[in-house]
């Protein structure tokens, strides 16, 4: 999709605060500092619309980005950040679970995993959770510009084996630096949201 119009509409922690205009929604989840904001910025062709940070745990609410008045990207709180209190982690978990299990507008989940490493227990738990609730998943391996392209297939195999990856889902290697994988991500989003591509 060629993006000209995007708006960060709201931050929410409860269903009563979600948008009410019935547009399809794509959630983005991942470990703190995995690159969710960088992916969003690349998808919408902005350098810093979604604020990136070297400080993990910055996203603490569900952030709704309306794109071309056709869909929402929903940036959910990152998980696995040790310096966030146990109580705060539990709160984040409740916010995410309530959204993913009860939101009728949700069309799919983009699960971001650091492509340089094996998935963490939290990464695996998120994937298993999504599959249990029959949420379509696109697994995006991020930071792939840190790895030589000759090793991408090996890393993909490692990640898929750790997740017990379901072939019905989609997997893509992504680089925020080069944009590799961007078009594949958009194709999946357009398919899930039943909107026409204008790349």
Curated annotation (Swiss-Prot):
Keywords of the record: Cell cycle, Cell division, GTP-binding, Magnesium, Metal-binding, Nucleotide-binding, Septation
Co-factor(s): Mg(2+)
InterPro entries reported for this sequence: G_ENGB_dom, GTP-bd, GTP-bd_ribosome_bio_YsxC, P-loop_NTPase, Small_GTP-bd
GO MF terms held by the record: GTP binding; metal ion binding
Domain EngB-type G: 22-195
GO biological process: division septum assembly
Stated family: Belongs to the TRAFAC class TrmE-Era-EngA-EngB-Septin-like GTPase superfamily. EngB GTPase family.
Protein name, entry field: Probable GTP-binding protein EngB
Organism: Latilactobacillus sakei subsp. sakei (strain 23K)
Gene: engB
């Amino acid at each position: 999709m060629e993006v000209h119009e995007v708006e960060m509409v709201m931050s929410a922690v409860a269903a009563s605060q979600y948008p009410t205009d019935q547009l399809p929604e794509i959630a983005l989840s991942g470990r703190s500092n995995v690159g969710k904001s960088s992916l969003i910025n690349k998808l919408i062709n902005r350098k810093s619309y979604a604020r990136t940070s070297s400080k993990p745990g910055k996203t603490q609410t569900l952030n709704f980005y309306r794109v071309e008045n056709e869909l929402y990207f929903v940036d959910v709180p990152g998980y696995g950040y040790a310096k966030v209190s146990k109580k705060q982690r539990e709160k984040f978990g409740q916010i995410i679970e309530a959204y993913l299990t009860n939101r009728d507008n949700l069309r799919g989940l983009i699960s971001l995993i650091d492509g340089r490493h094996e998935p963490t227990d939290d990464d695996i738990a998120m994937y298993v959770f999504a599959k249990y609730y029959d949420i379509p998943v696109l697994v995006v391996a991020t930071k792939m510009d840190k790895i030589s392209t000759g090793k991408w297939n090996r890393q993909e195999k490692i990640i898929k084996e750790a997740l017990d990856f379901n072939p019905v889902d989609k997997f893509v290697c992504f680089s925020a630096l080069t944009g590799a994988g961007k078009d594949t991500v958009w194709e999946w989003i357009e398919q899930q949201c039943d909107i026409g591509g204008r790349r």
